[in-house]
Each structure stands twice: as C-alpha cells, then as structure tokens.
Amino acid sequence: MGWVDRLLSRFKIRTKVMLLVLPFILSISAVGVTGMLASGLLQSRMAISNDVAASLRGFKDVYAAMIGFLDQTTEENRALVFSKLDEQRAALDAAGARLTPKAEGWAELESASAALSAINGRMDDLWALHADEARLEAGIKEALGVISTSQADLLTAATAFDKSISTQEDDAKEKLRDAQRILSATSFVVALRDAFAARKDDGEGYRAIAAAMGDLKIHQKLLPIALPKKSKPLGKAFSANVRALSALVDDKARPPENIEKILDVFAELKALKEPLEAAATAKMQHVSTTFEELDASVAKAGLVMQDTRHLTDAIYLTRIALAEFMLDRSAEKQSTLAMHLAQCRNALFALSSTAGDLGFAGEQSTKLATSFDRIEQSAVELVGATGKRTQQFQAAADEIDHIGEQISLFADLQRSAAGRQSQDANRLSIGAMVLGVIIALVSGAALVLTLKGPIGEITQTMRNLAGGLLDTAVANRNRADEIGEMARALDVFKTNAKARIALEQRSEQERVAAHAERERNEAEKLRRDQEIAFAVDALADGLDAMAKGRLTSTIETPFAPALDKLRTDFNAAVAGLRQTLLDIRTTSSVIQGSGRQMAEGAKALSGRTEQQAASLEETAASVDEIVATIRRAGDQAANADNTVSKAKQDADRSTVVVGNATAAMGRIEAASSHIGHIIEVIDDIAFQINLLALNAGIEAARAGEAGKGFAVVAQEVRELAQRSAGAAREIAALIGNSTAEVAKGAGLVSETGAALLDISKHILEISTQIEAIALSSREQASSIAEVNVAITRLDQLTQSNAAMAEETQAASWTLSGEADYLMQLVDRFDLGENSGSASETMKAA
C-alpha cells in the first residue's frame, strides 16, 4: 500500500480525491444499485407478509362471528359474518395483486379464495336452514295453541254434558218425590178415616180430625203441585173436600148431622184414592222409564269425563316433552315426544269412541289429530334441519381451517422466497464490492479501507437476520447515503419479521381461546340437560306423593327460569286440592260442632223448660194469693192501707215473674222453630230413603224372580221411611201447635203484665177510692182466675216441649256422628300437622 500512497502523493488533493473516490464511487454505485433492488424485493415481500398476517387475524374474527351466528341466528349476525368475509376477500385480493400467476404462493391464494366463496354459499345455506327452523317452530307453536284451546273446550263441553245429565236425573227424582207426595196424601187420608171410624165417641172423632188438620192442609197444598196437568181436577176435588172437612170440624155447634157429612167427605176422599194412586203410578212408571233411559247417559257421561281427563293428562305430558325437545333437538327427545303423541292419539281415539256422537267431541278431535300430526312432522323435520345446520357449520369451519392452512403455506413460501432473494442480494453486493476493490485496489486503498467497515457491518447484519438472529442491531441507519438506506431497509425487514412472529403467537392464542369457548358451550348444554332432568324428576316425585295422598308435599327447589312455571303451577294445583279438602274438613267440623251445640242446646232447653214449669206453678200460686188478697180487700176495707202496701209489693213481684215468663216463652218459641228445621232435615232424609227404596224396587222388578226377596225388603224399607216421614210430620205439627199455644200464652202473659201494671196504679189510688177498690177487686179476681187457667195450660205445653227437646237432642247426636264419619274420610289425606291438630281438637270437643 506504500507505493499507492507514494503514487497518489504526487497528485493534488482534489485529483487524488477524485482518483481515489472515482473507483470507490463506481463500486459504491454498483453496491447501491444492488441494495436498492434487494430493498424493493424485501419491501414487496414484507407487504405481502403483512397482508397474510392481517388475513390470519381476520379469519379468526370470521370464525368468532360464525359462532355468534350459530348461537343467535339473526339478520345482524348474518350481516356481520358477510362483512368479515368481504374484508378477508379484499385482503386476499390485495395480496394476490402483488403477485403474478406464476409466482410462488399464487395457487395457495387461489385455493383460499375459492374456499372463501364456498363459505359464502354455506352461510346462505345456514340462513335458509334457519328460515326452515323458524317456520317449523312457528307451526309447532300454532299447533300447540290449537291443542291448548281444544283441551280447554273439550273439558268445558264434557263438564257441561255431565251437568246436563245430572240435571235430567234431578228432574226425574223430583217427579218421583211428587209421586211419593201423592201416595202420602192418600195414605194419610185413609189413616185419618180409619182413626175417625174407630172413635169411641164423636168428641174423640172431632179431636182426631182437628189434630190431623194441620198435616191434612199441608197435603192439600202439596198435592196440586205434585199432580200432572191432566190430573189437576183431582187436586181441586181433594182441596174442596179438605176445606169442607175443616169447616165441619170448626163448627162449634157440632150438630149430629155433621157426623154424616164428615163420613160423606171421607167417602169422596176415598173415591179419589184410586185415581190419585193411578196418577202416582203413572208418574213412577214415567220416572222408571226416564231412569232406564238415563242409565246409559249417566254411564256415558262418566266415561266421557274419564276419557277427557285421560286426554288432558296425556296432553300435559306431551307439552312437557315438547318443551324438552325444543331445548335439545336430538333424535332421542324426538322419539320421546312421538311416544307421548301416540299416547295422546290413543286417548283421543278412546274419547272419540265414547263421545263420537257428541258434536263437540268430533270437532275437537279433528283439530287435535291435525295438531298432533303437525307437531310430530315438524319435530322430525326440525331434527333433520338441526343436523344439516350442524353439518354446514362444521363444513364452513373446516373450510376456514383449510384457508388458514393455505395462508400459512403461502406465508412459508414467501418467507423462503425472501430468504433466497436476500442471499442473491448478498452475493451481488459481495461481487460488486470485490470488483470495486480490485478496480480501486491501487488507487483507492484508503477509500476502500474507509468504506469496508460500514459495508461489512451491514453485510454481517443481513447474514444474522437471514440466520434468524432478529435481536441483532442494525448499524449505520442514520447515514444519508445508500449505505444508510440499506441499513434502514434491513431494519424494516427485521421489524416485519418480529411482527410476523408475534402474529403467529397471537393466532395460536386465539385458537386456544376458540377451543375453550367450544368447551364452555358444551358445558352449558350439559347444564341445561341436567336442569330439565331435575325438573322432570321433581315433578314425578310430586305426582307420586299426590297419588299416595300426601298433599303437603310441594316442590320447593326452584327450577331453571324457563321451567320454573311448571313447578309453580304444580304447587298451585296441590295447594288448591289441599285447600278444598281443608274446607271440607272445616265444614264438617262446623257441622259436628253445630250438632253438638244443638244437642247441648236441646238439653239446656229441656232443663229450662222444667224450670219454666216450676216458675209457672209459682206464678199460679202467686195469682191465687192475689185473688185471695183482692177478695179480702173487698171484705176488709178498714185495713185498706195495709192491704195497699202488701198488694203493691205482690204486684211488683208478679210483674217480674210475668216478664220472666214472657222471655222464657220467647226462647221456647225460638227453640221450637229450630226444632222445626231439624224435623225438615229428618223428613228430607226419610224422603231420600224412600227414593232409594223405590229405585231398589224398580231394579228388583227388572230382575224378575231373582229380585222378589229384595223387592220385599225394599218395600219394608220404604214403609219404614214413610212411617219416619209421618212421625216427622206429626212432630212438626205438634211443634207448630206448641208454637201457636206458646204465642197465645205469651199474649196472655203480656196481658197479665199489663193488668198487673194497672193493679199497681189502682193500688196507689186505693186510699181515696176504697169503694172503687172493692169493685175493681172483684173484676180483677175474675180476670186472674182466667189467667190461672191459661198458666195451667201453659204448664202442660211446657212439659210437652221438654219431651220434644229430648227427642231433638237425640237427633242432634245422630247428626254429629255422621259429621264424625265425614271427618274420618277427610283425615285419610295428609293435609299437614296444623289441619290434623285442628281436626283432633274438634273431635275432642
């Protein structure tokens, strides 16, 4: 190098610089041109790498948008997926625009673009499947609405049909009661005629008729109502004879010819017996025919209600199975739904067979059958549509994976091409530098030494980057010459390489996140299945407890929000049934308590009646004393002042006694009215027994010879019921007479009280009106004697009321026993400790 320096030292500095710089400039120019070419190639490759990285991120967004579309298939989510697909198509087109058809990676980009177009087609298929599913779901919802409406209409119509049959049966029973009233009237007249014929004297005959006149007038009122329209004249004739008989009995003179007239009236009444019995028999025959016609209708109404309930229960189970199927549209759930629909069809066929001739059954059966078929067909199509949608989504996901693989392969090809181009650029740069060194070896040794260091550093840095050492620092980036540009281009390459690696790491993280999201979705589906299974098991346990009579068992654990209404409806149904039985128990307890209270009241009434009798005796004695006092007052005018004082005290005591007697008679009258109501209940019971005996006789007559013995027993029961009814009517008549007598006695006692008040006033005036006292005393003595007679009669009636109160007490205990039996029937159900303890408390009382 010394000789070069000596050679150059002979030239001027500018010439030397020019001589030294010219070869250096030439070599640098060659290296610069080579660097520019390499930098352009690298920038193009890095732009393509950026587009590929953006596409990879975008396809992750596409996959996430497709998952959202599958979970919630809406127009917004569909538009979002297409928007993401359009963005990826634009990115792929931008990457392809930088390549020629023969460039490396062109085939991979074309494959990815074709797969992207296929995804667009599959999205259209998914949307069409969603539209089919929405149509099928709407059809199922519409069919379910028809089923619910038809279910309610069927139950309402069946209940109305059953009620109409019951109404016809009640009408037939009422006609049977009319026949019984007709026969009872004829039997009563015959018995009264026999009693009159067996009289010992005329007075006894009149008393017998007078005693029976109240009941006879009752028959007079009831008979025209009970007779059929064509037999109304018989009722008028019966009423005319009863009025004639009443007029003869009410005749105070009672001449002997009245006996003949009474016998004539009885003869006319006897003549009415046969046509009245014929009318009653005709009514009973008509009732028997009606009962025969109603037997089939009653049985049919029971079967219709039974089949309707079976169909209703099957529909409820089908609705539960349908709810489970809509949450999990699997073949297994569809099979379960089909099984329940088959049960509904069987129940519907049974109802159609039973009630086929009824208009409501045929109309609703057609609607229900059509709805069952529609739900079953829609469920099958839903299973297929759900499977197709899953397949289409999986195919789209596979195509996205294929696109990712193609883009990754394209990125690898671009990476390899960039490496080769980098090596080519390095070789060109080294060749240019060697050539420049050779050309300027002598003349530009110093300049070569000056340029060799930076170029060597850049070369080494490029080798390190090509070898994967991305942490290598790029020197000379701040130079303004071509070396600086090469350093900056190299730094951009390093930065893009780092970004690509970071992008690959983020893509891996997003793939892991997508896998975790799929696992969460599967866990959510498993949780929903468990919630449905729990709800079904809880309902099954509740129904089993209800079947065993445990009405206190409810479902306390809440279901899932979508299923919790089943739990609340079930609990409400159990609570309603339990409350109904509790109401029955409460009513039975009230009847039980009322029966005991009636018995105790009757017992207390008997005791008070005895006390009243004693009080009446004391009152009679007091009245006798008053009579004696008044007589002595007339004879002993001289002792008027002392007598006035004593009479005033006696009058005050008598006023108190009369007030007590009036109040006691009021209580007796109220008790008699209550006893009358009890007698009406007993009469109704006797009528029901008579009705049952008559029905038994009709059935025995149908049985022929085999039913004769049963017919005899039924006749005996019927006669016993008639005697019971007759006894009840006699008691009612006695109570009516007692009530009338008590009312009369109360009036007399009230008059007595008024008289005693007048006595008190007159006693105050005795001092100045001694003579008037004597006259008034005689008048008062006469009045008080009449009062004494009335009190004696009242005492007899009071004794009779005591006997009736004892009979009422016995009837009340019988009523209480029947209420106890009803309580035992209700106690078979488990209605809770509170209700049970209340029942035991009532029984203990």
Swiss-Prot record:
It comes from the Bacteria. It is a multi-pass membrane protein. PROSITE patterns: CHEMOTAXIS_TRANSDUC_2, HAMP. InterPro entries: HAMP_dom, MCP_chemotaxis, MCPsignal_dom. Gene3D superfamilies: HAMP domain in histidine kinase, Methyl-accepting chemotaxis protein. Residues 587-816 form the Methyl-accepting transducer domain. Chemotactic-signal transducers respond to changes in the concentration of attractants and repellents in the environment, transduce a signal from the outside to the inside of the cell, and facilitate sensory adaptation through the variation of the level of methylation. Attractants increase the level of methylation while repellents decrease the level of methylation. Belongs to the methyl-accepting chemotaxis (MCP) protein family. This is Probable chemoreceptor y4fA. It comes from Sinorhizobium fredii (strain NBRC 101917 / NGR234).
